UniProtKB/Swiss-Prot annotation:
It comes from Rhodospirillum rubrum (strain ATCC 11170 / ATH 1.1.1 / DSM 467 / LMG 4362 / NCIMB 8255 / S1). Keywords: ATP-binding, Cytoplasm, Magnesium, Metal-binding, Nucleotide-binding, One-carbon metabolism, Potassium, Transferase. GO terms for biological process: one-carbon metabolic process; S-adenosylmethionine biosynthetic process. This is S-adenosylmethionine synthase 2. Homotetramer; dimer of dimers.
Amino acid sequence: MAQSEYLFTSESVSEGHPDKVCDRISDAIVDAFLAEDPHSRVALETMATTNFVVLAGEVRGPDSLTHDRLKEIAREAIKDIGYEQRGFHWKDAEIVSHVHSQSADIAVGVDAAGNKDEGAGDQGIMFGYACTETEELMPAPIALSHAILKSLAEFRHGGDTSFGPDSKSQVTLRYVDGKPVGAASVVVSTQHAGNLSQDEVRELVRPHVLKVLPEGWMCPEEEFYVNPTGRFVIGGPDGDCGLTGRKIIVDTYGGAAPHGGGAFSGKDPTKVDRSAAYAARYLAKNVVAAGLAEKCVIQVSYAIGVSKPLSVYVNTQGTGQVDEQRLAVVLQQLMDLSPRGIRQHLQLSRPIYARTAAYGHFGRKPEKDGGFSWERTDLVAGLKTAFGA
């Protein structure tokens, strides 16, 4: 039986969080390869700690992207985020590259040849989700958590020196009859200038929270937590070691939907961990946008070297207006879910990934250059026609 009233929480982390610094660097390198050769293969991991960055992974692409060029790309990403502190500075951080060529065994099993279609780059399961809680058809807790941190980042990039790049947010919403009605608590931890007190930071953060929450949704004052430890001056990779791919729930639905376990950043779009998760979101969003359900979970699965998905599962969580099995069939008629089909349909072989590395891969606006193409709702007409809606 569904609960009539409950609390649900999601968190976000900023572009300056140590793990997000690594995601940004990894995706900037993916973009660099795709910009020169859209057929590049990239699996790039980054580690960042006190003034030290390690690049590692496997690539196949243009020779112009040397180790020195990869280091430059990493440095540019750190600069763009805004790190100019003693323990982590874009100018003098030591950056080493241990990137090497992709395994020939993987290439043979995955690449298309002759009459053989391109196979998936690995086995795995991927999920997509959409719901009617926000205009972006995203769960409200993660959408609001992202929005708070984006507001802080815009303030900082505008020239204010009160905040540092590293911050986190967490929003707990109260639900009644399955709908969010207000915030029960809000937590914001943000790196700040050393001369600011906790109370001063609290009042600087407050307007960014109020701007984001719908009117009347602000939590009780005693449930509004800003820097609960009292001080947050040392931040970023100088405070905690960062790694690519460690914020997969922040990147997706904030825990409101299942996750297959595969991270996105650092992977070119032939990797189904990334491309199939984007496709699953695209399909789920179109189902909800078409009015066929208020909630939609889609799971797809793949095997390495096999071009078609092994399974496609649709669950509208009791909100559907149509048969779920038929919906799964129709979705596969509207979109080729082979790795190549996904990449072509969503035009993913473009340098569009660095921008995804912070504030969520989903719930963003489609961009003219093809960025966030998986947020389009151009299947709505086809779905309505198929179901006579």
